Amino acid sequence: STYIDTIPAQVSADGRLHAHFIQAGTTTGRFSSSNPNLQNIPIKSERGKNIRRAFIAPEGCMLVAFDYSQIELRVAALMSQDPYFIQVFKDGKDIHSAVAMKVFGVKEGEVTHDMRRRAKVINFGILYGMGVNALRQNLGTDRKEAQLFHDNYFAQFPTIASYLESIQNFAKEHGYTETLFGRKRYFPGIRSSVPFIRAMAERMAINAPIQGTATADIIKIGMKRAVDDLDKAGILGDVNLVLQVHDELVYEVKKEHVGEAIKIIENAMKHAIPSEFLANIEPVPLEVSVGEGANWGELKE
């Protein structure tokens, strides 16, 4: 009802929604959206898909969505320089299955759906500074097994362990963290005398460089590069960015320019990180999935 009841009343006379987007609307540096908040429309539920089907392209146009694939884990690989993670992404393999192989001690063909699901929880949990108790709850297991997964993860990926520790130590010493591009986020609570406030700040600090780099800095640089490249190609007026949802960019494209626009925007997003920030480190490929269709709820790759 949040969307079904309120969105129709917010449609302007031109048949469009003119939502507000705030460039620094979150502490991580990500965009936020309001009036209405189009970033919170569900995608996995059938109702969410039906709501998205109501967002249609004008006559003569298509909606084309570009979505970064596993961007936070790719950035984690880049910033930690973990050799296993980097190789998995270079080989084009699934990172959650690859981590499951290590954590559960199985071969590639032996990874079950449940193992991959658990590895995904562990991957994001560790990167978000999740402790053993939180892992236990999210995995639906007991503390002993959660502790085993936690310890095994750090034993298998010592480079990631040392990277996360260095981030936390830096934040404790300086009171802030930095993204790959040097954007700072301050954590006044990290020196608090109140234990739970200090612990919360430490958890947030662990993930801040990764999340800030991935879902804020890179997406914005990709957006700017796409605009510049579309302008150079002379089709900027026929390719309009209409929505940004975290890792996803949605464009309204004149049908005759869809193919060209996809190549330009996909390339801009894949090469969003300027080369000077990759000097002396092993790069990690950024991958983008593309879907197009007449409405936002039915986009085909």
Range-by-range predicted roles:
Residues 1-301:
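Conserved catalytic core of nucleotide polymerization and phosphodiester-bond processing enzymes
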